[in-house]
């Protein structure tokens, strides 16, 4: 697929969502509305992955690894364009939590003696990660939600002169709430704090502009709305924070030797051993990136740019709007704001066990979280027939 508009722009031609549906085989086997848990691969990503596996089986060394490094670099550039960042601000990561942990470890000096402010609509593993850091003397302030929305007044009261970091999810995995990160950035920066944003449930689903939003650091995996695989993701670190406020937690780079037998061209002005650290955001990478992940990400990011994130969001909104109207009539109480623009909606469910049994019997997939919270997350390949199938099963 050719590179078309950037993530927040509309494509030159309206997307053909029925054609797109045919590109996702999962749509033929079930009404899969659990994309916030794991997104199915398209036929294009699957074919690209098969080509790589075929090369691993039959063609290793022909050509050598640099040929596949181009796919990796292309994925990096496509993601940078998606969130309006520079390529040098993007590192590869194995997961969102790992990326955020590396940032926290690299900010140890900056965080010392201060506090981190977050809220209870953040991802639970992230909250646990923060909580464990209290053992090192770091104060963690978790602001409770009010009516399933971020309490901005309480956030403002919690952010003070000792706050070093404010951390939120742009889109909550709990109910799909889109956080006002621009306002949180202004609150944080006014008090000398930085803003980290978990974009796991946002990247590929809603437009992101890290510059306009005032985001200092962000991370995501690719197996949700970026339509990739597990074990591969991205970390964004603003350029002027790299190596200073955010130091690499594991040092990467290489060395060259200025003595025989390593070289017969000695440089008399150079040191015997030259250490060359990794530059840019790559200094935060703690392992060799997965080429399987890069190849899937490259293909899916091309697809996302071609369709356009705004078009993807508008399509999903047409499905979630219907759910917001019809499910309350069946006794399900929405905990997602009606004006919310993410593709995730959640409902308090009167009888979770019975509801899930009905849905499974009808071939409908959703998630049940936190006991009785039914989370429904349609994507680009879903249609009104999928929604009808869900509603009929629960009627």
Regions found by a protein language model. Give the residues of each.
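Pyridoxal 5′-phosphate
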Residues: 1-395
């Amino acid at each position: 697929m050719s590179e078309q508009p950037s993530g927040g722009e509309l494509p030159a031609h309206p997307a053909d969502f029925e054609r797109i549906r045919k590109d996702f085989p999962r749509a033929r086997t079930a009404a899969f509305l659990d994309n916030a848990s794991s997104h199915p691969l398209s036929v294009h990503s699957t074919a690209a992955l098969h080509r790589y596996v075929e090369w691993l089986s039959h063609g290793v060394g022909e050509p050598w690894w640099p040929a596949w490094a181009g796919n990796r670099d292309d994925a990096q550039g496509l993601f940078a364009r998606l969130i309006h960042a520079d390529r040098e601000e993007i590192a590869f990561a194995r997961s969102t939590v790992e990326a955020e942990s590396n940032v926290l470890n690299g900010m140890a000096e900056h965080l010392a003696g201060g506090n981190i402010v977050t809220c209870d609509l953040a991802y639970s593993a992230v909250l646990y990660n923060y909580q464990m850091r209290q053992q090192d003397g770091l104060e963690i302030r978790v602001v409770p939600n009010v009516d399933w929305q971020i309490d901005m007044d309480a956030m403002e009261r919690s952010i003070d002169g000792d706050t070093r970091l404010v951390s939120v999810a742009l889109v909550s995995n709990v109910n799909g709430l889109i956080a006002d990160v621009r306002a949180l950035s202004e609150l944080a920066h006014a008090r000398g704090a930085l803003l980290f944003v978990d974009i796991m449930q946002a990247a590929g689903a809603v437009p992101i502009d890290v510059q306009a939003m005032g985001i200092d650091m962000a991370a995501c995996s690719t197996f949700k709305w970026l339509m990739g695989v597990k074990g591969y993701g991205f970390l964004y670190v603003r350029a002027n924070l790299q190596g200073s406020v955010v130091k690499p937690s594991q040092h990467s780079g290489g060395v060259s030797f200025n003595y025989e037998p390593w070289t017969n061209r000695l440089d008399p002005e150079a040191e015997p051993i030259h250490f060359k650290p990794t530059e840019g955001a790559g200094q935060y990478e703690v392992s060799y990136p997965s080429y399987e992940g890069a190849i899937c990400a490259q293909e899916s990011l091309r697809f996302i740019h071609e369709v356009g994130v705004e078009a993807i969001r508008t399509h999903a909104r047409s499905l979630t709007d219907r759910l917001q109207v019809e499910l309350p009539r069946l006794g399900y109480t929405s905990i997602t704001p009606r004006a919310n623009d993410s593709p995730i909606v959640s409902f308090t469910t009167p009888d979770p066990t019975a509801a899930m049994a009905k849905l499974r019997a009808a071939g409908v997939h959703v998630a049940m979280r936190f006991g009785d919270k039914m989370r429904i997350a349609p994507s680009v390949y879903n249609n009104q027939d999928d929604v009808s199938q869900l509603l009929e099963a629960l009627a």
